[in-house]
């Protein structure tokens, strides 16, 4: 269990579930923690499906934006890219109709409340589901489509199933390639990851922002000890690369740096 937990970056209960699933063992959940986690995973899964359908079933600003960025349909599907429309509460209505309690929707950061009214946290944004190595949707990133909307990127808050410092975007897709290539390419963001993946460079992950953490370094070390840092070439990216290099070196990893333009 400990090996599965560490190798797949899972909580104890999730490691047990994964082993049970692989070996065809039926589990009877203890009341409390296990059930609580499962509802978060289910909420995120259904939200991801809702966003994906909005992105794929009819013309929308999100799909047009990604098309302008040159991302091919098969890559969009691979990463489960979605679209949060401009409605104030379409996701809220969808999920509450499925019977999910509002307090859980607020906890995972999909819904906010103001003066007794509930509204969607992500609106008019391209949605990037964050998926762990067990295939569970644990959070989301949302990229503003309108240049006047701030912040440019909106991410899920910390929750019982999402700890930003413990996860790497795209690792669910890239870990086999990392093992094959013998090294990992670490970039800043969602679009960096997707663009490189589309170009055939599939041993790539993102640190979910500019600040690499020690836990993320430990996670990388489970798969390889050779890291190529490819952060943006602006001042923030350079500073982050230097901080990241120090963290990785202190963890016993070999680090190379290459510069990319963009953001």
Model-assigned labels for residue ranges:
Residues 1, 184-186, 225-236, 258-260:
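Acidic beta-strand-to-loop metal/phosphate-binding motif
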Residues 1-103, 107, 125, 156:
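Non-catalytic accessory segments of DNA primases and related replication-initiation nucleases
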Residues 7, 83-86, 191, 211-212, ...:
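Short beta->alpha linker loops
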Residues 7-8, 19, 141, 208, ...:
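Glycine-rich, histidine-containing beta strand-loop boundary motifs that form or position
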Residues 9, 21, 25, 202, ...:
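Short, well-ordered loop/turn and helix-capping segments at boundaries between secondary-structure elements
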Residues 33-35, 39, 44-46, 87-227, ...:
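Phosphate-handling DNA/RNA-contact segment within nucleic-acid enzymes
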Residues 71, 100, 201, 252-253:
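Short phosphate-binding/catalytic loops that engage adenosine nucleotides
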Residues 252-263:
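C-terminal or mid-to-C-terminal helical accessory/interaction module adjacent to the motor/catalytic core
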């Amino acid at each position: 269990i400990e090996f599965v937990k560490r190798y797949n970056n899972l909580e104890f209960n999730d490691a047990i579930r994964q082993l049970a699933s692989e070996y065809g063992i039926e589990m009877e959940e203890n009341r409390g923690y296990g059930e609580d986690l499962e509802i978060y995973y289910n909420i995120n899964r259904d939200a991801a499906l809702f966003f994906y359908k909005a992105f794929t079933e009819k013309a929308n600003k999100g799909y047009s934006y990604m098309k302008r960025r040159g991302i091919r349909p098969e890559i969009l599907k691979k990463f489960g890219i979605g679209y949060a429309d401009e409605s104030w509460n379409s996701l809220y209505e969808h999920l509450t109709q499925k019977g999910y309690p509002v307090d859980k929707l607020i906890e995972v950061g999909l819904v906010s409340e103001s003066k007794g009214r509930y509204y969607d946290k992500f609106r008019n944004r391209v949605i990037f589901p964050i998926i762990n190595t067990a295939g569970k949707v644990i959070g989301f990133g949302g990229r503003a489509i309108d240049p006047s909307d701030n912040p440019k990127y909106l991410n899920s808050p910390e929750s019982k199933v999402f700890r930003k410092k413990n996860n790497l975007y795209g690792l669910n897709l890239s870990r086999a390639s990392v093992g094959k290539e013998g090294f990992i390419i670490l970039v800043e963001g969602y679009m960096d990851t997707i663009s490189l993946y589309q170009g055939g460079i599939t041993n790539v992950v993102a640190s979910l922002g500019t600040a690499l953490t020690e836990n993320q370094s430990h996670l990388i070390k489970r798969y390889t000890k050779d890291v190529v840092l490819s952060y943006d070439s602006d001042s923030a990216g350079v500073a982050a690369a230097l901080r990241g290099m120090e963290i990785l070196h202190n963890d016993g990893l070999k680090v190379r740096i290459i510069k990319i333009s963009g953001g």
